[in-house]
């Protein structure tokens, strides 16, 4: 059963019970962030994505998690992985220096994207300001399913 879940198409599932939301994020496989690969493999749909890089010690490090609207995953990933287009100097430096990777998950719901991004941001950078959730639930819980077994929470 667990192996079958890891091979599921990238998407976000949600169950709601007693004012609490339980999300399951099914990630795409981790792929090298090259523009032609992104154009071939990333759909032009709404969703969330993570960017990673491989450091000098061959450890994978998270750069960011973000969201994209309709038509946006492909174009947003293309933009955010191109050092000539990225405005933030620290990102540009990482993109120029390291091999970068991405993974994504699809969800059409803007509110679900807000909740998932809020949860991840809260976990990744405790004590830092986080994006607002949708305000629909008292508590948000999340589980990740990754074909690469890369689980960050």
List where the protein language model places each region.
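Boundary/linker segments flanking structured domains
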Residues: 1-63, 67-153
């Amino acid at each position: 059963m667990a192996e079958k879940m890891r091979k599921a198409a990238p998407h976000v599932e949600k169950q709601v019970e007693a004012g609490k939301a339980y999300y399951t994020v099914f990630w795409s496989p981790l792929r090298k962030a090259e523009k032609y690969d992104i154009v071939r493999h990333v759909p032009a749909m709404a969703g969330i994505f993570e960017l990673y890089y491989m450091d000098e010690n061959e450890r994978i490090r998270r750069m960011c998690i973000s969201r994209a609207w309709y038509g946006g995953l492909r174009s947003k990933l293309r933009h955010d992985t191109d050092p000539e287009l990225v405005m933030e100097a620290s990102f540009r430096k990482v993109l120029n220096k390291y091999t970068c990777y991405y993974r994504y998950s699809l969800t059409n719901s803007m509110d679900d994207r807000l909740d998932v991004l809020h949860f991840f941001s809260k976990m990744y950078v405790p004590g830092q300001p986080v994006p607002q959730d949708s305000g629909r639930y008292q508590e948000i819980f999340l589980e990740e399913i990754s074909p690469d077994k890369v689980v960050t929470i």
